[in-house]
C-alpha cells in the first residue's frame, strides 16, 4: 500500500467555515462533544480543544473521535491530559485523522504521539506528513522471500533466528532484560546493517526513554553533530501520559517506518517497547467508551486492535519493516490474553527466563522456550539446523537430569549422562555474551558474533574437542577462540596461585 503523504501538518483544515462543536461531558480522558446537525466528524478525525482554564493557563488538547453516539454527539479520546477542560468549551473538527511528520527529517529526533518534537532541538524541518490510520498493504504488494536477519547475538542467531521483514516478540516479566536486549539490537543493527530504525516507546518508564536516548548518542546511532546522519527516530508515549497517547503512539511510530519503506524504499527496523502497554491503554479507555469488558478485564476488541497494528508491519516489494516487540508478560503468565493475542502474529519469539537471569547468564534468553519459524533446513541450511537441534537436545537432557542430580548427586549418573551435563553447562555459559550497551556495568567489552562463528563454536563444544576446558572459560565471551584464550588465562592464574 503506497503512502499518500500530504504537505500540510496536523493543523485545523482551512475551510471557509470551521466545523465547531462544544464539550458536553468529560470522564477522565474521554470527552463527549456535541456538533450542529449534519456536521458530525468522521470516526478517527482529530478534534482540537483550545482555550484557557480557570486560572488563565492556555489549553491545547487534541482528541480522536472513537464513537458516534447519536443526538449529534461524538465520543473522543484525549491525547494529552484533560486537566482544566470544562463543559461548554469550543471544539474544532480538523476534518482529517491525526497526521505526523515523516521522512529523513525525523531521524535523530524525539516525537510525541502527535508528531511534535519534544527534544528541545527546535521545529522539525519537514512539510511532509502522513495520517496514522491506514489500511495494511494488499496481498499482491507483499514480498514473500525468506531470509535470515543476523543480529550478532549467539543465542538468537543459532536457536531462534529472526526473519528479515518479520515480527519478533521479546517475552519476559519485569526486570529480566527486555529493554537492554532491544538497545543491543538497535546498536548492532545500526552498525552491522546500516539500516534505519524507528523506536516506539509505548507506555514504558520515562527514565528508560531518557537512558535509551543518551545511550544512542554515545554509540553514534544518533549523531549530535549532524542530526541528519542519525539512524533512528524516536517516538515516546510514556507511562505518565494519558491512555489515548499510549494507545496511538505505536501507530505514530509505524507511520514513520512505513514512509521509509514505501517512499524511500528502505529496510526498516521498528522497535516497540512495550506492545503489552498498547493493549493496556486500550483496556483503560474501553470501559469509558461503554464497552463490556472481555476475559481478564481486557477490551472485547483486543484481537481487532492488535490486528490493525500488526498487519501493517510487513515486507512489500519496495522495502521491509522488521519489527522487534517487547512483550511484558503479566505475572509471567503466557496464557494471559494480551501476550497470547500477540503470539499469533509473530514469526519468532525470544523468551527471557528469570531462572537464567538469577544464574547471571545474560542475555537471559531461554534456549528451549524461544522459537522461530525460520529454523528449517531449507531456510537456514543443514549445518545450522543440525547444530541448533543438537544444542537443544543436550540442554533438554540436562533439564531432565536436574532432579536426579539434586536428589542423588552428579556421581550417580552414567558416564554418558555426566558428559552430557558437562557439555550442557558449557553450552549454557557460551550462550551468554557481553553486550555493547552493558559495558558500563559489566566492565566487559561488547561482542558481535557472526552466524558462521556461532555455529563453529557450538559444533566444537558438541564434538567433545573442548571437554578439557573449564566451564567458566565459556562465560561472557564472544566467539569460541575467546573461550579457549580465557581457559589458558585461567590455567595460568591457577598455576601462579600454587
Curated annotation (Swiss-Prot):
GO biological process: proton motive force-driven mitochondrial ATP synthesis
InterPro entries documented for this protein: AAA+_ATPase, ATP-synt_VA_C, ATP_synth_F1_bsu, ATPase_a/bsu_AS, ATPase_alpha/beta_chains, ATPase_F1/V1/A1_a/bsu_N, ATPase_F1/V1/A1_a/bsu_N_sf, ATPase_F1/V1/A1_a/bsu_nucl-bd
Record-linked Pfam families: ATP-synt_ab (PF00006), ATP-synt_ab_N (PF02874), ATP-synt_VA_C (PF22919)
Principal place of residence: plastid
GO cellular component: chloroplast thylakoid membrane; mitochondrion; proton-transporting ATP synthase complex
PANTHER family assigned to the protein according to its UniProt record, in alphabetical order: ATP SYNTHASE, ATP SYNTHASE SUBUNIT BETA, MITOCHONDRIAL
Task performed by this protein: Produces ATP from ADP in the presence of a proton gradient across the membrane. The catalytic sites are hosted primarily by the beta subunits.
Designated name of the protein: ATP synthase subunit beta, chloroplastic
Natural source organism: Phaseolus vulgaris (Kidney bean)
Amino acid at each position: 500500500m503506497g503512502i499518500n503523504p500530504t504537505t500540510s501538518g496536523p493543523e485545523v483544515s482551512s475551510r471557509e467555515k470551521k466545523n465547531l462543536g462544544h464539550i458536553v461531558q468529560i470522564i477522565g480522558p474521554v470527552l463527549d462533544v456535541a456538533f450542529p446537525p449534519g456536521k458530525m466528524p468522521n470516526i478517527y478525525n482529530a478534534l482540537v480543544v483550545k482555550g484557557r482554564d480557570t486560572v488563565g493557563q492556555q489549553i491545547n488538547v487534541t482528541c480522536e473521535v472513537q464513537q458516534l453516539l447519536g443526538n449529534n454527539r461524538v465520543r473522543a479520546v484525549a491525547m494529552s491530559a484533560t486537566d482544566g477542560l470544562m463543559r461548554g468549551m469550543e471544539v474544532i473538527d480538523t476534518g482529517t485523522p491525526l497526521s505526523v511528520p515523516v521522512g529523513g527529517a525525523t531521524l535523530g529526533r524525539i516525537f510525541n504521539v502527535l508528531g511534535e518534537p519534544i527534544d528541545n532541538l527546535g521545529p522539525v524541518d519537514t512539510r511532509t506528513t502522513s495520517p496514522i490510520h491506514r489500511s495494511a498493504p494488499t496481498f499482491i504488494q507483499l514480498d514473500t522471500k525468506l531470509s535470515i536477519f543476523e543480529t550478532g547475538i549467539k543465542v538468537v542467531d543459532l536457536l531462534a533466528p529472526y526473519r528479515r521483514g518479520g515480527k519478533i516478540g521479546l517475552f519476559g516479566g519485569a526486570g529480566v532484560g527486555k529493554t537492554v536486549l532491544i538497545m543491543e539490537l538497535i546498536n548492532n543493527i545500526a552498525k552491522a546493517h546500516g539500516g534505519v530504525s524507528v523506536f516506539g516507546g509505548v507506555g514504558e518508564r520515562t527514565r528508560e526513554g531518557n537512558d535509551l536516548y543518551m545511550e544512542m548518542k554515545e554509540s553514534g546511532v544518533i549523531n549530535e553533530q549532524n542530526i541528519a546522519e542519525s539512524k533512528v527516530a524516536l517516538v515516546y508515549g510514556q507511562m505518565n501520559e494519558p491512555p489515548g497517547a499510549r494507545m496511538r503512539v505505536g501507530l505514530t511510530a509505524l507511520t514513520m517506518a512505513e514512509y521509509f519503506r514505501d517512499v524511500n524504499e528502505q529496510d526498516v527496523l521498528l522497535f516497540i517497547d512495550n506492545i503489552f502497554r498498547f493493549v493496556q491503554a486500550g483496556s483503560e479507555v474501553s470501559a469509558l467508551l461503554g464497552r463490556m469488558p472481555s476475559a481478564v478485564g481486557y477490551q472485547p476488541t483486543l484481537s481487532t486492535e492488535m490486528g490493525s497494528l500488526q498487519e501493517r508491519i510487513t515486507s512489500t516489494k519496495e522495502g521491509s519493516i522488521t519489527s522487534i516487540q517487547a512483550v511484558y508478560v503479566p505475572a509471567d503468565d503466557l496464557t494471559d490474553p494480551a501476550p497470547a493475542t500477540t503470539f499469533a502474529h509473530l514469526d519468532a519469539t525470544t523468551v527471557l527466563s528469570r531462572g537464567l537471569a538469577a544464574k547471571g547468564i545474560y542475555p537471559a534468553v531461554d534456549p528451549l522456550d524461544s522459537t522461530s519459524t525460520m529454523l528449517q533446513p531449507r531456510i537456514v541450511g543443514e549445518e545450522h539446523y543440525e547444530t541448533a537441534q543438537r544444542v537443544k537436545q543436550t540442554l533438554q537432557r540436562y533439564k531432565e537430569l536436574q532432579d536426579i542430580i539434586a536428589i542423588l548427586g552428579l556421581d550417580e549418573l552414567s558416564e554418558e549422562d555426566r558428559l552430557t551435563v558437562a557439555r550442557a553447562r558449557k553450552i549454557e555459559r557460551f550462550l551468554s555474551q557481553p553486550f555493547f550497551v552493558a559495558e558500563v556495568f559489566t566492565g566487559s567489552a561488547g561482542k558481535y558474533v557472526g552466524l558462521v562463528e556461532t555455529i563453529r563454536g557450538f559444533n566444537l563444544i558438541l564434538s567433545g574437542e573442548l571437554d578439557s576446558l573449564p566451564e567458566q572459560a565459556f562465560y561472557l565471551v564472544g566467539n569460541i577462540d575467546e573461550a579457549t584464550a580465557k581457559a589458558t588465562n585461567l590455567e595460568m592464574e591457577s598455576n601462579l596461585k600454587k
